[in-house]
């Protein structure tokens, strides 16, 4: 009852993570100050100031760091959210694969290369599915599923 009395926000067709990401993008665009308080590692893909209330830490994620974290998840998957990554690629191997990739286009190219190697017949469909499950929306209008071409265009 207490939380309800403070007001709430109902979102149809949008996960809470996406709402946070959209609001963060709106704040960035408006040059407003904000801090995202959370314990969800997925939110670390979102640019801006973060506060982890379990660890009591404040830190900043820049755009490239957020994209890097997303690419790590595109390789490893996310067992909590039942998102399948690439077999045999855990966090350490994913970090090693991306270690010499500077810039979004290079990171995404490395992710694409890994998916092509693991699934030569249907890598494109699998990668697009993974992208659409992991990518956090930046605006209210992006309801459609992305294709690999749109994914590549979004990365630059």
Placement of each model-derived feature along the sequence:
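Extended two-metal-dependent nuclease catalytic cores across DNA- and RNA-processing enzymes
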Residues: 1-155
């Amino acid at each position: 009852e207490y939380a309800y009395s403070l007001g709430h926000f109902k979102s149809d067709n949008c996960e809470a993570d996406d709402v946070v990401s959209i609001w963060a993008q709106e704040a960035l665009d408006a040059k407003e100050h904000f801090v995202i308080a959370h314990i969800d590692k997925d939110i670390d893909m979102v640019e801006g100031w973060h506060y982890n209330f379990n660890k009591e830490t404040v830190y900043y994620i820049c755009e490239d760091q957020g994209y890097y974290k997303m690419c790590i998840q595109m390789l490893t998957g996310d067992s909590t959210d039942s998102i399948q990554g690439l077999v045999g690629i855990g966090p350490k191997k994913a970090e090693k694969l991306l270690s010499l990739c500077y810039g979004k286009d290079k990171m995404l190219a490395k992710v694409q290369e890994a998916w092509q190697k693991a699934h030569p017949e249907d890598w494109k469909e699998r990668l697009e599915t993974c992208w659409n499950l992991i990518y956090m929306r930046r605006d209210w209008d992006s309801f459609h599923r992305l294709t690999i071409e749109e994914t590549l265009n979004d990365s630059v």
